[in-house]
């Protein structure tokens, strides 16, 4: 389609364009759907700053590259944080928002509580691993790989160890992006008092098991 849709992935330093492609790719019959590896993730350069402001600026550069005055912004999980940040920074450029499994504030405590509730199913999930992920104190990329391998079953409705192992092997990890996101960005992330400023249509979806 002629209208532009930009989809932003979650999990800085872990996820990639493949995630929003799965979530939003079916809209390609109505939109030009663009997904990408955000700065510090996937095959994009692992060069900071890894701030919300920079990620918003990167989205705007993509919008400009496609020559769109306005577009539909989509994001899942942490990508939803950035979608909201973009909509508030550039309200005149957003036609609508699609938010998947996300929040307008730091939900770390809720995520940790939910993870601990299922930890008995997966013994590799320890308090130390959850603390390091959500406090942004991962040591290096090998440590990030080990931490994600422990919590990866939480991302599947039905855990498939072989599929999980393949996914981890194919992932390009960047612990610095994760650490900055959780140790710095999320400490001040709370947009609840500004949500009333968003005047475009918003579709909010959430998975029953998310």
Named regions from a protein language model:
Residues 69-112:
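Conserved hydrolase catalytic core segment
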Residues 97-135, 177-180:
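Flexible "cap/lid" loop of the alpha/beta hydrolase fold
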Residues 188-199:
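The feature captures the conserved acid-bearing segment of alpha/beta-hydrolase catalytic domains
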Residues 198, 204-206:
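Short beta-strand/loop motif that positions the catalytic acidic residue
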Residues 35-78:
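Active-site loop/oxyanion-hole signature of alpha/beta-hydrolase fold enzymes
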Residues 208-210:
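Acidic beta-to-alpha connecting loop that harbors the catalytic carboxylate
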Residues 1-46, 63:
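Conserved HGGG/HGGXW glycine-rich cap/lid loop of the alpha/beta-hydrolase fold
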Residues 133-185, 194:
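Conserved alpha/beta-hydrolase catalytic His-Asp/Glu region
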């Amino acid at each position: 389609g002629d209208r532009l849709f930009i989809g932003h992935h979650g999990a800085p330093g872990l996820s990639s364009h493949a995630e929003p492609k799965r979530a939003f790719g079916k809209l390609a019959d109505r939109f030009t759907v663009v997904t990408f590896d955000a700065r510090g993730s996937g095959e994009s350069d692992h060069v900071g700053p890894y701030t919300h402001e920079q990620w918003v600026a990167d989205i705007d550069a993509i919008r400009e590259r496609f020559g769109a005055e306005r577009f539909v912004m989509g994001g899942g999980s942490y990508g939803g944080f950035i979608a909201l940040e973009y909509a508030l920074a550039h309200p005149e450029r957003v036609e609508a928002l699609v938010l998947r499994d996300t929040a307008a504030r730091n939900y770390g405590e809720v995520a940790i509580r939910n993870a601990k509730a299922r930890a008995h199913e997966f013994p590799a999930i320890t308090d130390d691993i959850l603390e390091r992920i959500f406090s942004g104190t991962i040591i290096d990329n090998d440590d990030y790989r080990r931490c994600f391998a422990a919590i990866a079953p939480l991302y599947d409705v039905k855990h498939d160890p072989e599929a999980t192992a393949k996914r981890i092997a194919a992932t390009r990890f960047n612990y610095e992006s994760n650490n900055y996101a959780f140790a710095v960005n999320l400490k001040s992330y709370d947009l609840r008092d500004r949500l009333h400023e968003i005047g475009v249509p918003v579709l909010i979806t959430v998975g029953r098991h998310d």
